[in-house]
Amino acid sequence: MDMTGERRIVAPRQVVWDALNDTVTLKASIPGCESLEKTGGNQMKATAAVKLGPISARFNGAVTLSDIDAPNSYTITGEGQGGVAGFAKGGAKVFLSDDSGATLLKYEVKAQVGGKLAQLGARLIDATAKQMAEQFFTKFSAEVEKLAGLAEAAPGRAGIVAGGGF
């Protein structure tokens, strides 16, 4: 499955970049995310509960950031095992650019599922992936815009206020 999209976030690029590298912000934004912890370098481990059609699964996996060009772009890749439900793996290239006082975030996603999940069919998988992406970006935008407001209210505290960054 391939998916592309973009989102305009009303916050400076550096604040968006910091949030994309902050485990607290990401955990709050990822649908079903139960835990997200930095394990070293640009590595994280994650647990997420996902419902895809009739199948519910808890995925445990690893996430890696690469091709890092701060504060412009990176690639995030991950792979998770969902027990008898199967597996999911994929990645996203994320690009940031300035957009009239805001930040334009563009993404290109490639993902693959296997096991019982793969038997659900491309239409259901694609629809669920698009819904989860929309939920993520809605929450992420709200979190970042809240952080941007805090940074403006307390100059010198720009960046992630919540902590947990890389």
Walk through the language-model features, giving the residues of each:
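Hydrophobic ligand-binding cavity/cleft-lining segments
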Residues: 1-43, 51, 160-162, 166
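Short, surface-exposed coil-to-beta transition loops
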Residues: 4, 58-62, 88-92
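Hydrophobic pocket/interface hotspot
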Residues: 16-20, 26, 65, 107, ...
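A conserved amphipathic terminal alpha-helix motif
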Residues: 116-153
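Charge-rich (especially acidic), low-complexity segments
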Residues: 146-166
